[in-house]
Amino acid sequence: MQNLSLSLVILSVLIAVTLACKCREQSTKESFCNAHWVSHVKVKVRVGKQGLPEGSERKGLNNLRYTVQHVEVFKKPSNMTTLPDEIFTPSEAPACGLKIAAGHEYLLAGRVEGPNALYTVLCGQVLPDDRSQTSFENVLEWKNVPQTLQSQVKSIKC
């Protein structure tokens, strides 16, 4: 009986590891330069089970849609004068979707899908190069963004 219990525990751990989000570690500059947009946002509303807007590459997937206020934009595509106030992310953890809370502020990065939909995932978020300040595969709540990183995102040249 103990062997069966131990086998079930090991199987559960292996399944969790297999289904977990996997990201490649990147430097602050690499994450910033690979992103289409980087912004200090305040999350107003989170809505589940959303499809991406018309013209997006990913079809039929369940997404979370966040309505945000862009407090400060550090990077945006040159063809956009402002960033849209909606951000989409996968609702499934294995697809590296972000679970962030309404009413909180974050440093977020992502890409533009289709004509003008902002899309973000856990991988590629702009984090400090000093990993003692945050964990890898993380999203930074703005109050935890080190002062050095706040200054750095204002001056990175790609």
From Swiss-Prot:
Annotated Zn(2+) binding sites: 21
Q: Which GO terms describe its cellular component?
A: extracellular matrix; extracellular space
- GO BP annotations listed: negative regulation of membrane protein ectodomain proteolysis
What is the protein's major site of localization?
A: secreted
Q: Per UniProt, what is one GO molecular function of this protein?
A: metalloendopeptidase inhibitor activity
List all disulphide bridges recorded for this chain.
21-96, 23-123, 33-158
* Localisation: Secreted
InterPro entries in UniProt:
Netrin_domain, TIMP, TIMP-like_OB-fold
**Which purpose does this protein serve, as stated in its record?**
Complexes with metalloproteinases and irreversibly inactivates them by binding to their catalytic zinc cofactor.
Q: What is this protein called?
A: Putative metalloproteinase inhibitor tag-225
What organism is recorded for this protein?
A: Caenorhabditis elegans
Q: What phylogenetic lineage does the species belong to?
A: Eukaryota, Metazoa, Ecdysozoa, Nematoda, Chromadorea
